[in-house]
């Protein structure tokens, strides 16, 4: 695993942990609605996808997994913009930056194969 892959894993874990923190925080506050569950599911989604991306036994579907992770991340950013942008704080903006950089790195890995081993 090269530096690019390590960066991708770190960014995915960072955004996953942010979503886990938000989900737990919302549950602890007793806030109802779907948001706590969505945050927790987002955590699970990031962890499962980034694990599947680099799991040796799933290498044959790595390209598809990479694209799914990119779309998943983009969808997360878009839905945040549509649902919660008016309630954004510094943590939200940091998380969106992490997610955008994650997408950029995944695109780099997809289109420049030599980066996969660098």
Where are these regions (language model features)?
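Membrane-interface extramembranous regions
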Residues: 1-118
